[in-house]
């Protein structure tokens, strides 16, 4: 729901979806909202709501990942107290019942193993079917992802985003029973990475490394 002028009245709205173009949590920090009041939605141009945290009633799930393992395509949670270089990531929510997500090696089109990240593929009635008027092979491939050794009748939409699924156990609501759930973590777009000697890198990580290597380098410079 997009409300351009109308002020937010808690008595009128049950759930509001906001695009995370800015730091929404910081913007509303003065309102002293509960950590479960603002929820993340993983949206994609080919599917407006792939996963969501709305109505999960739990605080964001945080993991700290080994950066060296990430470069090799592996997901290795670590203790941030013992590894100060660990990357903090936050979940994007659970997969809706009418959606199927597969984490796939984008080059071999085989399912990624447990402990690996890969391209996020989606199978859902909410997915777009095609780009209007496009006959480009690249566009056709995005809507017709087939998993090697999988069901050939099932076509997936290829998001071009990297991520992984992670299983956690959390109580639902205050005093609730622990429930096992699978949540999606989104790492970023494949087009925003580059490979050197078989290792994956994000430009932002390279820039941060350069900024930390000498005190005279200005952070956030252009």
What are these language model-derived features?
Residues 23-29, 147-149, 174-175, 220:
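Short helix/loop segment immediately N-terminal to the Walker
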Residues 36-39, 154, 218-222:
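Acidic/polar loop patches that form or flank catalytic/metal-binding clefts of enzymes
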Residues 91-100, 106-115, 119-200:
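Conserved ATP-binding/catalytic segment of the ANL
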Residues 129-132, 207, 211:
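Amphipathic alpha-helical interaction motifs in eukaryotic regulatory proteins
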Residues 189, 204, 219:
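Basic, glycine-rich polyanion-binding accessory segments appended to enzymes
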């Amino acid at each position: 729901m997009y409300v351009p002028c109308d002020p937010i009245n808690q008595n009128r709205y049950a759930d509001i979806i906001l695009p995370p173009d800015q730091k929404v949590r910081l913007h509303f920090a003065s309102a002293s909202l509960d950590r479960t009041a603002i929820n993340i939605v993983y949206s994609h141009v080919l599917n407006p709501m792939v996963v969501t945290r709305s109505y999960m009633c739990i605080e964001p799930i945080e993991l700290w990942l080994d950066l060296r393992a990430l470069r090799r395509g592996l997901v290795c949670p670590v203790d941030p107290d013992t590894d100060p270089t660990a990357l903090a990531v936050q979940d994007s929510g659970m997969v809706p019942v009418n959606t199927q997500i597969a984490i796939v090696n984008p080059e071999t089109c085989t399912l990624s193993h447990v402990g690996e990240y890969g391209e996020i593929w989606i199978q859902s009635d909410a997915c777009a079917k095609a780009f209007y008027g496009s006959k480009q092979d690249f566009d056709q491939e995005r809507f017709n992802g087939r998993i090697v050794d999988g069901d050939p009748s099932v076509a997936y939409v290829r998001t071009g985003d990297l991520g992984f699924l992670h299983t956690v156990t959390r109580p639902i609501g205050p005093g609730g029973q622990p429930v096992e759930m699978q949540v999606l973590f989104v790492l970023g777009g494949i087009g925003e990475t580059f490979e050197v000697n078989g290792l994956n890198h994000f430009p932002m990580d390279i820039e941060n490394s350069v900024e930390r290597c000498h005190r005279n380098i200005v952070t956030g410079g252009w």
